[in-house]
Amino acid sequence: MIADDQQPEVWVGHIEMDTDQLEASEAFMIALGMRAIFKTDDIAILELRAATHLVLVRKDQIEPSEASFDLMVDDLEAYHGRLTNAGITPSAIEDGRIHNWFTVRDPSGHGITVNSSHSSGLTV
């Protein structure tokens, strides 16, 4: 068992998303607040908190869908406002049972849910 003042031993290393618009998708993720760290003709890698990497993979054709991951922010309302001011069109904020949330669509049409934080307040 991990003590409250210790970091968990594991975290998510990589998540992946296909895109038919690599450059536009990379720019979109940067606008969401991710850090670009590596790019080739076929992939772009962006860094999130805890050193999780989003790997964008160029594909000729994709079927837009809901992302297999979601994002979390400390202040959902402020973040929603920042995205709106940046020209991104998030959905309205919805009240959920555990989180409040909204969605955005990346340039390839994938839906990405952004949740309010549920941090336990313990060391992570």
Task: Show the residue positions of the predicted features.
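Structural preference for long, well-ordered alpha-helical segments within the folded cores
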Residues: 27-31, 82, 108
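Conserved catalytic-core motifs of GNAT/GCN5-like acyltransferases
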Residues: 35-41, 94-95, 119-124
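Vicinal oxygen chelate
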Residues: 11-20, 60-86, 100-105
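Active-site beta-strand termini and strand-to-loop segments that position acidic
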Residues: 46-51, 104-107, 117
